[in-house]
Amino acid sequence: MGTLQPLGAITEEGFDAMFDVNVKGLVFTVQKALPLFQEGGSIILNASSAASMGAPGFGVYGATKAAVRSFARNWSLDLKDRRIRVNAISPGVIPTPGYASLGLFGEPLQQFIAALVINIPMGRIGEADEVARAVAFLASDERSHITGIDLAVDGGMIQV
């Protein structure tokens, strides 16, 4: 969940709503599901490239996703005795219905995406199936020695 909240226009209600969904909701969902996880399982958290790069109006959203990155690192230690791997995935610009929460539709959305594509080394936005394949990669038992990472699926955007 994310809405544009530039500094000076951040409301306490908007701030709380974003942290309630992206941070508090995540913590208590994972905690509630924890007894269901088998030893050697895998938890993959949904972070965002917004945690690693600045963008106007994305300060609060980016902060919530930085918290998600931190959870992956810390929870991988909390769950090491159960050999449960915890990783995060950070999608870049991926067209999803979530853009509606930003109030971006039609031409303004296309302009927003075009401005971001300029800084993506792969020269294009990503697709949802590319993120899904990255999640499957992390979830695989063949990746049993990967934990605590934040895998960027963003065409290299946050690396440059």
Where are these regions (language model features)?
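Substrate-binding pocket helix/loop in short-chain dehydrogenase/reductase
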Residues: 6-7, 11-16, 116
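Active-site helix of classical SDR
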Residues: 30, 64, 72
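Residue(s) in the substrate-gating loop at a strand-loop-helix junction
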Residues: 48
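Short C-terminal tail/terminal secondary-structure segment
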Residues: 53, 136, 147-160
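Active-site loop immediately N-terminal to the catalytic Tyr-X3-Lys motif
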Residues: 7-8, 53-59, 81, 123, ...
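Alpha-helical segment proximal to the catalytic Tyr-Lys
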Residues: 35-36, 77-81, 144
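Short, flexible catalytic-loop segment of classical short-chain dehydrogenase/reductase
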Residues: 86, 91-102
